[in-house]
A protein has these predicted regions:
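Glycine- and acidic-residue-biased ligand/ion/polar-headgroup-sensing regions
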Residues: 58-71, 75-76
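Short histidine-centered beta-strand/loop micro-motifs
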Residues: 31-33, 41-43, 51-56, 64, ...
Length: 134
């Protein structure tokens, strides 16, 4: 896990980011990737953008919406989400999130499983021409 900075008191420090990447839909920052059974990311989706409709064979995901509003689709069922909402995505479920607001949609993603590589992503639909295996 990353080493914290600051005083160690609540609100007194932050975790140092491990990896940052920009994508066509926004960006993500890896917050924790050293455990063998989970990985934690902060994900930002720009207004009007959405992630690919995808599946994972070796991990589940839990999303906690920090700010903004959007729609989450799991196995073809879409539900609205906003700050404070949480979503559980089982292993193998087809899923995506879309920003339906006019501000960034920010959420924390906790992946749980035994493998977190890009090749455990099967993109069923993608707005940016990336459909197919990761």
């Amino acid at each position: 896990m990353s080493e914290p900075t600051g005083s160690g008191q609540p609100g007194g420090g932050v975790w140092a980011a491990r990896e940052y990447d920009e994508r066509p839909w926004g960006s993500y920052t890896v917050l924790d990737d050293e455990a063998h059974d989970h990985k934690v990311k902060r994900i930002v989706v720009k207004p009007g953008k959405r992630l690919s409709y995808q599946q994972h064979a070796r991990r589940s995901e839990h999303w906690f919406i920090v700010s903004g509003r959007g729609a989450v689709t799991i196995d073809a069922v879409a539900v609205p989400v906003a700050a404070g909402h949480a979503v559980d995505i089982p292993v193998g479920a087809a899923h995506r999130i879309e920003n339906t607001g006019n501000a960034d949609l920010v959420f924390v993603e906790v992946q749980h499983g035994d493998y977190f590589g890009e090749d455990d992503i099967v993109r069923l639909e993608d707005d940016f021409g990336r459909a197919g295996p990761g």
